[in-house]
A protein has these predicted regions:
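Bacterial N-terminal signal peptides that target proteins for export
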Residues: 1-8
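Bacterial N-terminal signal peptides
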Residues: 8-16
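Gram-negative and organellar
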Residues: 22-474
């Protein structure tokens, strides 16, 4: 189950095209005619942290320093070439060699050439993330491996006037795992009919068919005589509306998975709603139910919730079995000049198609308070809690993290100090999981420099520096 890092963002506010999401390509029919528009930032970041429990164990604690260097992005450019970047990738080095140096982070990026009115659009996207070897063990480099997924392919648009468009697309995806034998190739084709209603609203009918083939034939569970691939088919109808104070997406349909010649289906839904209830306050709710794989889950809405140095794991721990993902999220954001408050939570279930003993549920909550002390001086307090449960084994963990950050903005650069701690308790039940129980205290300093755009300085930039075990990176 994924552990949500940093302040949780509304799933409808961050949208990266991915396999199975053709509707995110050129959703608006017609065009404004305006030139490229850019928002957000790309930062260089570096930091040094001290932890009194680098191994994240209950006993035999070992202190260590952790150096970090990398980049942090929350950037969007819209135009003939549209670019979206969200996340971070860091290089970690443990000074006392508690673990070997490694890359760590969670990143989603895509580049889309062409506009909805063009007959051809081309997508290139990449997702980089971390997978858990033991789902309940501490998130140290010894229990993590990186996973990368690249997706590319064309979208062919046939526009009928300014209100109707027919789209065909074909995508190729490649998932690569650092050590696990689950690397695969995905071929997906689909079609979409979109009709613009009134204003900034549209209605679309979508269908897709994806084939995922493992490079190692033994990776398909129950595969003898059943080939090396599985299939996911999906059909849905979707409404999108953009109003002055409200954004809404409502998609309903049905999806089917065929794995090792065993077929099963379930309803699909995707609900995203955000509303500004005052000039300073926005509330949001969301819900999602779909079939996914580990690599594909990194591109799902719940994988895009971390930014500005945070990092996430993909859904569950690394296995070749796809799963049914169900998620509900809600929260509110208050921003009134000197003060910011964000409260959010997520409840999620992963139901595995072939390994039901790994079915799990996860609940997370996050509260972030920020205050501008001076025009360029910020303070922020973040409190984060999570609960994860594998009911088949009666195994679970629960944790709480708190961090205080003080930051100073100097033109394109920012400096910060932070201190905090994590307390986690776990029980392995009747499983072989290493359900970690530990506590640790961390302090650190960081530096960021805006390479592109400018980060929104609210006291939290660089929080946790993407270091495993530090607050914000459970």
């Amino acid at each position: 189950m994924k552990l949500i890092a940093r302040t949780l963002l509304l799933i409808s506010l961050v949208s990266v095209p991915a396999l199975g999401r053709a509707q995110q390509i050129g959703q608006q029919i017609g065009g404004t005619g305006y030139g490229p528009m850019s928002t957000g930032y790309v930062d260089f970041l570096a930091g040094l942290a001290y932890t009194d429990n680098a191994l994240l164990t209950a006993g035999g604690q070992r202190n260590d320093g952790i150096g970090t260097v990398g980049f942090d992005a929350d950037y969007s450019r819209q135009g003939t070439l549209s670019i979206n970047l969200l996340g971070n990738i860091d290089r970690l080095q443990y000074i006392r060699n508690s673990f070997s140096g490694s890359f760590y982070g969670n990143f989603n990026g895509d580049a889309l050439w062409g506009t909805p009115s063009d007959p051809l659009q081309w997508l290139l996207s990449d997702s980089f993330g971390e997978g858990m070897v033991d789902p309940l063990a501490a998130s140290t480099p010894a229990n993590l491996q990186w996973v990368n997924q690249v997706t590319t392919g064309p979208y062919l648009n046939l526009n009928f006037g300014l209100r109707n468009r027919f789209t065909l697309y074909g995508l190729y995806g490649r998932s690569s795992y650092q050590t696990s034998p689950y690397s695969s190739q995905t071929y997906e084709g689909g079609a979409e009919i979109t009709h613009k209603l009134a204003g900034s609203t549209s209605l679309s009918l979508q269908a897709s068919d994806a084939r995922t083939a493992y490079l190692d034939p033994a990776a398909l569970i129950g595969s003898p005589g059943h080939g090396t691939a599985y299939y996911i088919k999906q059909a849905q109808i979707e409404f999108q509306g953009r109003y002055v104070r409200t954004n809404v997406t409502l998609g309903v349909g049905y999806n089917i998975i065929d794995y090792a010649r065993h077929q099963q289906g379930a309803p699909y839904y995707n609900v995203q709603l955000s509303r500004s209830i005052s000039p300073f306050t926005t509330v949001f709710v969301g819900a999602l139910s779909e079939y996914a794989s580990f690599g594909g889950s990194m591109q799902s809405p719940t994988a895009l919730l971390g930014a500005e140095g945070g990092a996430l794991q993909g859904a569950g721990f690394i296995t070749s079995s796809p799963f049914k993902e169900r998620m509900v999220t809600a929260g509110a954001d208050y921003n009134r000049g000197l003060t910011t408050v964000t409260l959010s939570g997520i409840y999620q279930q992963d139901l595995y198609t072939q390994q039901s003993q790994y079915d799990n549920r996860d609940a997370t909550a996050d509260l972030t308070l920020g205050r501008k002390l001076q025009p360029t001086l910020f303070i922020q307090l973040q409190v984060y809690g999570s609960y994860e449960d594998y009911s088949h084994y009666h195994a679970h963990t629960h944790s709480i993290t708190a961090m205080l950050t003080l930051s100073k903005q100097l033109a394109r650069a920012a400096f910060g100090l932070y201190a905090g701690g994590t307390q986690q308790s776990g029980s392995p039940g009747v499983s072989s999981f290493n359900a970690a129980s530990y506590h640790d205290i961390e302090v650190g300093v960081y530096f960021t420099y805006d390479l592109l755009g400018q980060a929104n300085s609210s006291g939290g930039a660089g929080l946790g520096m993407g270091v495993p075990g530090l607050p914000g990176v459970p």
